[in-house]
C-alpha cells in the first residue's frame, strides 16, 4: 500500500505489535513526491528528540507560504520547524560500548536502512535529490521515500540514477530545509520509547552519512545524538573475503544481490529500490557473519566521529 502525501491530510501510523496508534503530523500537504509505504508486519513505535541550532538562514522563495498538513489544522512549515521540541540531548560518553552491554538492547534499538541520491559526488557542494529509508522491523508505513528539490544546484549525474532537474526543481518537491523535520518525524514514529536508532547505509561512512551531515549542517540542524551510523560496506567486504580469501570479490550492492540470489524491486540507483535491496542484503550479512545487535552497535559511528574525520581530511 502506497500513500501519496498529496492525497491525504491526515495520517496515522498503525502499530501492529501493540494496540497504540501514533499520530503523524507535519507532512507536506502538496508534496506529490513524498510517500509512506505500508509494509504489513509487526512493529513498535516510539519517540525521539532532535534539536535545531539557532542559526539564522535564508532560502530562496517564501517558506511561510508552504503549508503542511497537521492533525487538527494546517500551519506553515516554518512554524513546524521553529516550534519543535528544542530539548537538548546531551552527548553520550562511549555510547556504543555502553549500549552494546545493555541486556535489553533489542527493546531499545531501531534499525533503519537508508539510501541517498545526489546531484553529484562532491560532498560539500552537491545536494541530496532523493532519500529513502526502511525500518527493517516492517509494519505499517515503515518505508519512507521522497525526491528533494536541490534549488539552483544542477544535476550532473542523471545518467546514473535517472533523476533529472525537471523532476525535482518543482514547487511541490520539498527542499532539504523543509524535508529534515519531516524525516525526523518519520524516524521518531519508528523509534522505540527511550531508544536509539541505527541508520544503515552501504558505503555510508564515505558517502551517504557525509552528505546527510553536510545537509543537516547547511540547514542548521544536528544529527540526533541517539542516532548511530553503520556502514554496511565493511561487513560486505568481510563476508566476501571469507568466501574467497584469495580472490577480491566485489562488495557492491548489485554483486551482493547476485551472490544472495536476491531480486531487485525497481530501478538500480534509485533510493527506494536500493533501500529495499539493502534491507535484504544487510540481514543476510548479519546472519553469515553471525553478528548480534551488540556486535553491530560496536561497529557503528556517531555523527561527531564522521564530522571529525571529514574535518581532518579537509585539513590534510
UniProtKB/Swiss-Prot annotation:
Mg(2+) 2 binds at residue 115. Keywords: Chloroplast, Exonuclease, Hydrolase, Magnesium, Metal-binding, Mitochondrion, Nuclease, Plastid, Transit peptide. Mg(2+) 1 binds at residues 115, 117, 274. One of its GO terms (cellular component) is mitochondrion. Transmembrane segments: none annotated. Changing residue 123 to W: In dpd1-3; loss of activity. Residues 112-282 form the Exonuclease domain. Inhibited by free nucleotide diphosphates (NDPs). InterPro entries: Exonuclease_RNaseT/DNA_pol3 (IPR013520), RNaseH-like_sf (IPR012337), RNaseH_sf (IPR036397), TREX1/2 (IPR040393). One of its GO terms (molecular function) is metal ion binding. The active site is at residue 269. It is found in: Plastid, Chloroplast; Mitochondrion. Gene3D superfamilies: Ribonuclease H-like superfamily/Ribonuclease H (3.30.420.10). Belongs to the exonuclease superfamily. TREX family. DPD1 homologs are present in flowering plants but not in moss, green algae and animals. This is Exonuclease DPD1, chloroplastic/mitochondrial.
Amino acid at each position: 500500500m502506497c500513500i501519496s502525501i498529496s492525497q491525504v491530510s491526515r495520517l496515522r501510523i498503525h502499530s501492529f505489535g501493540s494496540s497504540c496508534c501514533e499520530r503523524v503530523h507535519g507532512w507536506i500537504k502538496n508534496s506529490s513526491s513524498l510517500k509512506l509505504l505500508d509494509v504489513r508486519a509487526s512493529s513498535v513505535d516510539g519517540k525521539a528528540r532532535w534539536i535545531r541550532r539557532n542559526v539564522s538562514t535564508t532560502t530562496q522563495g517564501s517558506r511561510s507560504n508552504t503549508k503542511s498538513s497537521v492533525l487538527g489544522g494546517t500551519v506553515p512549515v516554518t512554524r513546524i520547524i521553529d516550534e519543535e521540541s528544542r530539548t537538548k540531548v546531551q552527548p553520550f560518553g562511549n555510547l556504543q560500548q555502553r549500549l552494546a552491554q545493555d541486556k535489553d538492547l533489542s527493546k531499545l534499538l531501531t534499525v533503519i536502512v537508508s539510501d541517498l541520491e545526489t546531484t553529484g559526488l562532491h560532498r560539500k557542494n552537491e545536494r541530496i535529490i532523493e532519500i529513502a529509508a526502511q525500518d527493517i522491523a516492517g509494519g505499517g508505513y515503515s518505508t519512507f521515500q521522497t525526491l528533494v528539490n536541490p534549488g539552483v544546484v544542477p544535476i550532473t549525474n542523471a545518467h546514473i540514477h535517472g533523476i533529472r532537474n525537471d523532476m525535482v526543481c518543482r514547487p511541490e518537491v520539498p527542499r532539504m530545509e523543509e524535508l529534515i523535520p519531516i524525516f525526523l518525524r518519520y524516524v521518531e514514529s519508528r523509534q522505540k520509547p527511550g531508544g536509539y536508532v541505527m541508520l544503515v547505509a552501504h558505503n555510508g561512512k564515505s558517502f551517504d552519512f557525509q552528505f546527510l551531515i553536510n545537509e543537516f549542517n547547511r540547514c542548521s540542524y544536528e544529527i540526533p545524538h541517539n542516532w548511530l551510523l553503520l556502514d554496511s560496506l565493511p561487513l560486505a567486504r568481510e563476508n566476501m573475503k571469507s568466501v574467497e580469501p584469495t580472490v577480491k570479490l566485489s562488495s557492491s550492492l548489485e554483486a551482493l544481490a547476485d551472490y544472495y540470489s536476491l531480486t531487485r524491486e525497481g530501478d538500480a540507483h534509485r533510493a527506494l529500490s536500493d533501500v529495499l535491496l539493502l534491507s535484504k542484503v544487510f540481514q543476510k550479512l548479519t546472519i553469515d557473519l553471525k553478528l548480534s545487535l551488540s556486535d553491530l552497535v560496536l561497529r557503528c559511528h556517531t555523527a561527531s566521529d564522521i564530522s571529525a574525520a571529514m574535518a581532518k581530511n579537509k585539513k590534510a
